[in-house]
Amino acid sequence: QVNFTPNWGT
């Protein structure tokens, strides 16, 4: 399980 929160795609 990977918890990745990208700051792009706003």
UniProtKB/Swiss-Prot annotation:
One of its GO terms (biological process) is neuropeptide signaling pathway. The modification Threonine amide is found at T10. It is found in: Secreted. GO terms for molecular function: hormone activity. GO terms for cellular component: extracellular region. Keywords: Amidation, Flight, Hormone, Neuropeptide, Pyrrolidone carboxylic acid, Secreted. Its main location: secreted. The keyword Secreted applies. The modification Pyrrolidone carboxylic acid is found at Q1. InterPro entries: Adipokinetic_hormone_CS. Hypertrehalosaemic factors are neuropeptides that elevate the level of trehalose in the hemolymph (trehalose is the major carbohydrate in the hemolymph of insects). Belongs to the AKH/HRTH/RPCH family. This is RO-1. It comes from Romalea microptera (Eastern lubber grasshopper). The lineage of its organism: Eukaryota, Metazoa, Ecdysozoa, Arthropoda, Hexapoda.
